[in-house]
Structures are given as C-alpha cells and as structure tokens.
C-alpha cells in the first residue's frame, strides 16, 4: 500500500490539506496528517481546529511515497520554519 504524509502547521488552508487526505484515502492510500507544531491540534487558516494523526518527531519520512505541503498563510511560513521538515524535503528523492 502506498503511503503519504500531509504536513500541517497553524494557518494551513483547510481545503488544500483535507481534500487531499479525503481523495487519497478513498483511493486506498495510507495517509497520515502530520503536525509540525509540536502538538496534535492544528488551527487552520479559517480558525478550524484539526487534530493531526501524528507528530513530526514520530514519523519515518523515508517510508513515504508522497509528501504533501498544503498552502495557506501563515501555514506555509510555519512549514518553512520547521528545520526537520526542511531537512526531510532536501533529502527526499
């Protein structure tokens, strides 16, 4: 089974993050939402709280077939500020 991580940070665009999760899960992909905020509850760009499946520190980024970074402000800035995520993206092949 294919595996995907959708990385969430405070201020992410809810439609961009959650639609991807919905469509991929319907297609049979093992999708995990990953918080880069150090806590599972993330606040979307439109103040919608979302509980991530897992924290960034608890994933093995090498086992994913797909990495998804939703847009939104300030979500993209919060993703960019996460050193571990930046390192993972640079190493991802």
What do the predicted segments below correspond to?
Residues 1-92:
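Extended, subdomain-level signal for the structured scaffold at the beginning of enzyme domains
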């Amino acid at each position: 089974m294919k595996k995907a991580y959708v990385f969430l940070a405070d201020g992410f665009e809810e439609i961009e993050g959650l639609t991807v999760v919905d469509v991929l899960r319907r297609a049979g992909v093992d999708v995990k939402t990953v918080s880069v905020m150090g806590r599972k509850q993330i606040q979307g760009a439109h103040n919608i709280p979302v509980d991530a499946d897992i924290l960034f520190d608890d994933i093995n980024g090498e086992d994913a077939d797909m990495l998804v970074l939703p847009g939104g402000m300030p979500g993209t800035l919060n993703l960019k500020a996460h050193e571990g995520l930046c390192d993972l993206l640079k190493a991802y092949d």
